[in-house]
A protein has these predicted regions:
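Signature of dsDNA virion morphogenesis modules
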Residues: 1-184
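Charged/polar low-complexity intrinsically disordered segments, enriched in acidic residues
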Residues: 171-222
């Protein structure tokens, strides 16, 4: 079942490329598989199979998750005419963004910032429909994102990693609400399973005592 939208923003190898024939591009890997990520209150890993069958039909490329502005690029069904190309590999999801630096001032500024090293991070917004947890009762549980149902957008971000300013921290907290809800659900399921196990053990013990009592009565009647 799909849950709320989540975002992750970290430092990745973002590169600016220029080709006289084909224009200016930004390439990077916003989603990395099997990499342990410290989210502050838990450790998260994205499974190598997390993007199998994921909805990548309409993914936009933004700056700082600004959905009010004009997207700098877009992938529609990941066809060859899209201005953003997505490629799922054994290591994660790579992107190649074709920037219109001639007609779009934001695209030109972003390209310059990436080339200079001023902008070094990418973030992606996604929806998880399957995850699992380990060490759920500890202060630092471990989450595995088993499957992502949809990737909504990818953004270039200025503050990709911890520590962040209070504004980014607040934003990150909101983005992780879905993950926290998933953890609470896992903890509740564990508690319910333990309660059921305890009840089953109690009933089994009671039945065993009853059987022993019946056997004693039978023995006395013989």
């Amino acid at each position: 079942m799909d849950r709320g939208k989540e975002t992750r923003a970290f430092t990745f190898d973002v590169r600016a490329e220029e080709n006289e024939q084909h224009g200016t591009f930004i390439t990077g890997t916003p989603i990395v598989f099997e990499q342990k990520t410290d989210l502050g209150w838990c450790q998260e890993t994205i499974s190598r199979n997390a993007l199998n069958g994921t909805d990548l039909k309409d993914v936009r490329f933004l700056i700082g998750h600004d959905t009010t502005g004009i997207p700098l690029a877009r992938s529609r069904n990941n066809n060859e005419n899209s201005t953003m190309q997505l490629s799922v590999t054994e290591n994660g999801m790579d992107i190649r963004v074709d920037l219109d630096t001639e007609n779009n001032a934001e695209a030109k500024a972003l390209y310059s910032a990436v080339r200079r090293g001023d902008m070094s991070g990418m973030s992606f917004m996604f929806v998880v429909d399957k995850d699992s947890w380990d060490d759920v009762e500890s202060d630092y549980p471990k989450r595995t994102v088993e499957h992502i149902s949809r990737v909504i957008e990818v953004s270039a971000v200025a503050f990709p990693a911890y520590p962040q300013t209070s504004i980014q921290v607040a934003s990150e907290d909101a983005a992780l609400d879905s993950a926290r809800a998933s953890l609470e659900s896992a903890r509740k399921q564990l508690a319910e399973a333990r309660a059921k196990q305890a009840e089953d053990e109690r009933r089994t013990a009671a039945l065993e005592r009853l059987n022993n009592l019946v056997e004693e009565v039978k023995h006395e009647q013989v």
